[in-house]
């Protein structure tokens, strides 16, 4: 297709870019505003409201609380009839204790600008199809998109687009990049607090957590090239003269495939159960839905 309604595709692209340029000041303000008030996963109430307010000011109706997630949203612009459905995905959660170190304020703003610009010109073009923007909370842990997928949040979407900031200028631009599968585990141990002068009267939950980390390190020679397991201890006591009665650790797991994530998770769960047996601390394990590996569609990328 080289023309639409007698106008070249390049000219339509120019119109879309001109609309984006018109929105530039508002988009920059939106990005800075989200950046200035970072919110962690599923708590992005201000951020999602700011994006919806921007979209509504551009004349779009928004569905807040999409997929029964309070900080998710959706807006839609339909064409002249049934056709391809493209969705721009917006992320806007921040890293705990860091803020927007991964630039989700930029992701949200780019998605908002791309949707608003394309949707407006899309109507002028008079073609069939649909343009959507979908607000996806809790990317930095919480598996927001996986939950939305299970609830039908992406039903009917033919292809989805998202941008992610990086460093290095144009030499680091990636259009058709693959992505590894990922998952996470939260492992908690409940023991028995005691005074450090009488450790035998307690059950050290921190020792159990440390045992899990040590066992994982022993298993690393068995890891495949793209396997990655990183963990942190979130809770492990509050005073050095008290045997910790509770510990909580979180593990981020990446691998080439969902199948391998499942295998790695089972290995770590085995470590946790052995630590429970060794120390006597009771273990509780929580997992999030696994993100599948990503395969880009080259024709769409082009």
Model-predicted segments: where are they?
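Metal-dependent amide/peptide-bond hydrolase catalytic core
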Residues: 1-11, 210-302
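Solvent-exposed beta-strand sheet faces enriched in polar/charged residues
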Residues: 65, 89, 134, 232, ...
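Residue-level "edge-of-site" marker
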Residues: 67-68, 165, 289
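Conserved short loop/turn motifs at secondary-structure junctions
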Residues: 39-40, 134-138, 289-293
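Conserved active-site and cofactor/substrate-binding residues in soluble primary-metabolism enzymes
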Residues: 22-25, 42, 46, 50, ...
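Generic secondary-structure signature for well-ordered alpha-helical cores
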Residues: 21, 25-28, 32, 36-39, ...
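Acidic/His- and Gly-rich active-site-bordering loop/insert found
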Residues: 2-132
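Histidine/acidic-residue-rich, glycine-tolerant segments that coordinate divalent metal ions
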Residues: 71-77, 93-101, 105-106, 122-244
């Amino acid at each position: 297709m080289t023309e639409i309604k007698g106008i070249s595709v390049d000219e339509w692209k120019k119109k879309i870019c001109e609309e984006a340029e018109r929105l530039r000041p508002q988009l920059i303000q939106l990005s800075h505003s989200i950046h200035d008030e970072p919110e962690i996963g599923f708590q992005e109430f201000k951020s999602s409201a700011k994006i919806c307010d921007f979209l509504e000011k551009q004349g779009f109706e928004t569905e807040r609380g999409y997929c029964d997630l309070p900080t998710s949203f959706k807006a839609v612009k339909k064409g002249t009839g049934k056709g391809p459905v493209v969705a721009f995905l917006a992320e806007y959660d921040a890293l705990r204790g860091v803020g927007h170190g991964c630039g989700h304020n930029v992701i949200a703003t780019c998605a908002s600008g791309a949707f608003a610009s394309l949707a407006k010109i899309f109507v002028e073009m008079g073609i069939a199809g649909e343009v959507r923007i979908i607000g996806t909370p809790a990317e930095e842990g919480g598996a927001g998109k996986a939950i939305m997928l299970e609830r039908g949040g992406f039903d009917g979407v033919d292809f989805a687009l998202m941008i992610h900031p990086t460093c290095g200028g144009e030499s680091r631009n990636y259009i058709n990049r693959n992505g590894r599968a990922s998952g996470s585990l939260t492992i908690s141990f409940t023991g028995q607090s005691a005074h450090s002068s009488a450790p035998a009267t307690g059950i050290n939950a921190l020792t159990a957590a440390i045992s899990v980390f040590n066992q994982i390190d022993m298993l690393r020679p068995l890891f495949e090239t793209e396997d990655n397991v990183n963990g942190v201890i979130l809770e492990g006591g509050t005073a050095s003269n008290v045997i910790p009665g509770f510990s909580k650790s979180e593990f981020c797991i990446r691998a080439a495939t969902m199948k391998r994530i499942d295998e790695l998770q089972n290995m770590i769960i085995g470590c946790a159960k052995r630590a429970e047996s060794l120390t006597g601390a009771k273990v509780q394990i929580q997992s999030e839905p696994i993100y599948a590996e990503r395969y880009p569609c080259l024709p769409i990328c082009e």
